[in-house]
UniProtKB/Swiss-Prot annotation:
<comment type="similarity">
    <text>Belongs to the eIF-3 subunit H family.</text>
</comment>
<keyword id="KW-0648">Protein biosynthesis</keyword>
<dbReference type="GO" id="GO:0001732">
    <property type="term" value="P:formation of cytoplasmic translation initiation complex"/>
</dbReference>
<dbReference type="GO" id="GO:0008237">
    <property type="term" value="F:metallopeptidase activity"/>
</dbReference>
<dbReference type="InterPro" id="IPR045810">
    <property type="entry name" value="eIF3h_C"/>
</dbReference>
<feature type="region of interest" description="Disordered">
    <location>
        <begin position="1"/>
        <end position="28"/>
    </location>
</feature>
<comment type="subunit">
    <text>Component of the eukaryotic translation initiation factor 3 (eIF-3) complex.</text>
</comment>
<protein>
    <recommendedName>
        <fullName>Eukaryotic translation initiation factor 3 subunit H</fullName>
    </recommendedName>
</protein>
<dbReference type="GO" id="GO:0033290">
    <property type="term" value="C:eukaryotic 48S preinitiation complex"/>
</dbReference>
<dbReference type="GO" id="GO:0016282">
    <property type="term" value="C:eukaryotic 43S preinitiation complex"/>
</dbReference>
<dbReference type="InterPro" id="IPR037518">
    <property type="entry name" value="MPN"/>
</dbReference>
<keyword id="KW-0963">Cytoplasm</keyword>
<dbReference type="InterPro" id="IPR050242">
    <property type="entry name" value="JAMM_MPN+_peptidase_M67A"/>
</dbReference>
<feature type="domain" description="MPN">
    <location>
        <begin position="33"/>
        <end position="174"/>
    </location>
</feature>
<dbReference type="InterPro" id="IPR027524">
    <property type="entry name" value="eIF3h"/>
</dbReference>
<dbReference type="InterPro" id="IPR000555">
    <property type="entry name" value="JAMM/MPN+_dom"/>
</dbReference>
<comment type="function">
    <text>Component of the eukaryotic translation initiation factor 3 (eIF-3) complex, which is involved in protein synthesis of a specialized repertoire of mRNAs and, together with other initiation factors, stimulates binding of mRNA and methionyl-tRNAi to the 40S ribosome. The eIF-3 complex specifically targets and initiates translation of a subset of mRNAs involved in cell proliferation.</text>
</comment>
Length: 354
């Protein structure tokens, strides 16, 4: 069995990380995430036991920190273990989950298992994970550890024949806006944040042990070859209709976000017009006071007492737009695969006799 000694020098444990936190680069960028096959199997098992539920759990592993003396160096992340988070009702206290996670990591540490929290995972059907809750949880993880990522597992897309496991992290621009809690239109525009740059996708590499790689050819030889043809199924009505339905719901949500912004714009225009009218009346009143030799009234008082409408947060619209973009990509990719199946099916059919 391969020893983990080489990784002890390359990666740092939590205790070592606390000792070198002062030397860490302020904005460590993760360019590669390595996930053990055991972690993938645990995530899949958790999702299968709770179908159509956004199950979650913490990721444990090791981190290679970026050297502060080398600004161009990137951080590397290795996910070696995970465990599911228990389901709680809305009436339960959130501290129950936190206490459970802390206790689990303490037990793992006692048995010499990697116990450093390097992120979290979530199961999301059809890629429905771009929401404010996911962004807020990821912000809390990256605030405590800049290299943290969220692994998104899609069980529906996986059933189509390809494992759907992606890693995401909040961009530096999004982290800055989250830290100041300012997602108003002006702040978003000045930061240059778009729906494409809220989350950054990080490449994922799945690592299997040497014994598992040796076992794969043996399992492949015993595989029922008839199951391979299930991928050629042309009946894609259920998948496509569900994707289109989610796409329409996303467009409705985006329309609501646009209506909120338009309502704010109208209220802001009315408020500005009201302030301009009050200032104009105050100037006319001051002219009369000057003519009588009386002291003028301050215009700054009107400006200070004037209430302007609060601009709406643009985070919701950015995430909804990113979600719509994901649905469009899924429809495009699946349509391309379906056309390929149709051409293959046509080529295998005997030509009709004239």
């Amino acid at each position: 069995m391969a020893t983990r000694q080489p990784y002890q020098k390359k990666f740092q444990s939590r205790d070592q990380r606390e000792q070198t936190s002062s030397q860490q680069a302020p904005n460590s960028v993760v360019k590669q995430v390595t996930v053990d096959a055991l972690v993938v199997m645990k995530i899949i098992k958790h999702a299968r036991e709770n179908p159509h539920e956004p199950v979650r759990g913490p990721l444990l592993g090791l981190s290679q920190l970026a050297d502060a003396s080398k600004p161009g160096e990137d951080a590397l992340l290795e996910v070696t273990n995970c465990f599911p988070t228990p389901r709680v009702s809305d009436d339960d206290d959130d501290s129950i989950v936190q206490q459970y996670q802390v206790q689990m990591m303490r037990w793992l540490r006692e048995v010499n298992v990697d116990h450093m929290n390097v992120g979290w995972y979530q199961a999301a059907d059809m890629g429905t994970f771009f929401d404010e809750d996911v962004a807020a949880v990821q912000f809390q993880h990256q605030r405590h550890m800049a290299e943290s990522v969220v692994l998104i597992y899609d069980p529906v897309l996986t059933l189509q024949g390809t494992l759907s496991l992606s890693a995401f992290r909040l961009s530096n621009k999004a982290m800055e806006l989250f830290s100041t809690d300012s997602f108003n239109p002006k702040a978003v525009r000045e930061a240059g944040l778009t729906y494409r740059t809220v989350f950054e996708k990080v490449p994922v590499t799945i690592r299997a042990s040497s014994m598992a790689r040796l076992l794969i050819p043996e399992l492949s030889a015993n595989l029922d070859q008839s199951e391979i043809f299930d991928r050629m199924d042309l009946n894609a009505t259920s998948f496509m209709s569900r994707n289109i339905k989610l796409l329409m719901e996303g467009i409705d949500d985006l329309s609501q976000e646009a209506y909120k912004f338009q309502q704010y714009h109208r209220n802001a225009t009315k408020a500005k017009a009201s302030l301009d009218a009050q200032l104009e009346a105050r100037r006319a009143e001051n002219e009369q006071l000057r003519a009588k030799g009386l002291p003028e009234k301050s215009e700054a008082e009107l400006v200070a007492n004037h209430k302007t409408p609060t601009p709406p947060s643009r985070l919701g619209s950015l995430l909804v737009t990113a979600q719509i973009n994901t649905f469009c990509k899924q429809v495009s990719d699946f349509s391309g695969q379906s056309f390929g199946k149709l051409y293959i099916a046509k080529a295998t059919q005997p030509e009709a006799e004239e």
